Amino acid sequence: MTELNKYIDHTNLSPSATSKDIDKLIQEAIKYDFKSVCIAPSYVKYAKEALKNSDVLVCTVIGFPLGYNATSVKVYETKIAVEHGADEIDMVINVGRFKDGQYEYVLNEIKAIKEACNGKTLKVIVETALLTKAELIKITELVMQSGADFIKTSTGFSYRGASFEDIQTMKETCGDKLLIKASGGIKNLADAQEMIRLGANVWVCLNQFQLWKNYLN
């Protein structure tokens, strides 16, 4: 199994995050060789420069956290993020349109953003807390069709994060055709390891750095 550090997108998407906070995040990611840092779009260029001599990737978010921006806005955000050096894009679907049955709209939006990624990794945030099991299966199928690389459970701004059931349902639906990012819902190392066992390829939670230090000890 891959070392646990390579499952971690070290994240600070707080609206009050300062450059000092981002510096701290970056230095922790370098020290522990995490997979990536996940930060607001305005910090992408800054982080890319700070990480240029490391293997840590730069991830940012699009249409975040509510996902109801126009597709054209999300595409523009994506293009700018890629120009600024983003290696990975985490986009939020339009959950309302999806729940309304506008599947073609949702699929075409993901495809448009994937094209704007210009070869960079695309993760699709579906906000599992707001979906029924049947809806989760359907959106997983749409993400598979879109050409995206990952399906991601949550923004961290809804009432709950990932559950074991979410990960199991997504994995049973997509098999090896998509990678899975579990966001939130992880309270301890046992939870993180269970998410990985069920099929998660990346995980993130509010206290992930403390969990990582516990893992080292």
UniProtKB/Swiss-Prot annotation:
Q: What GO MF annotations does this protein's record show?
A: deoxyribose-phosphate aldolase activity
Compartments it resides in: Cytoplasm
Biological process (GO) annotations? 2-deoxyribose 1-phosphate catabolic process; carbohydrate catabolic process; deoxyribonucleotide catabolic process
Asked whether the UniProt record includes Cytoplasm among its keywords, one would answer: yes
Q: In which pathway does it act?
A: Carbohydrate degradation; 2-deoxy-D-ribose 1-phosphate degradation; D-glyceraldehyde 3-phosphate and acetaldehyde from 2-deoxy-alpha-D-ribose 1-phosphate: step 2/2
User: Record's family?
Assistant: Belongs to the DeoC/FbaB aldolase family. DeoC type 1 subfamily.
Q: Function of this protein?
A: Catalyzes a reversible aldol reaction between acetaldehyde and D-glyceraldehyde 3-phosphate to generate 2-deoxy-D-ribose 5-phosphate.
Q: What is this protein called?
A: Deoxyribose-phosphate aldolase
List the source organism: Metamycoplasma hominis
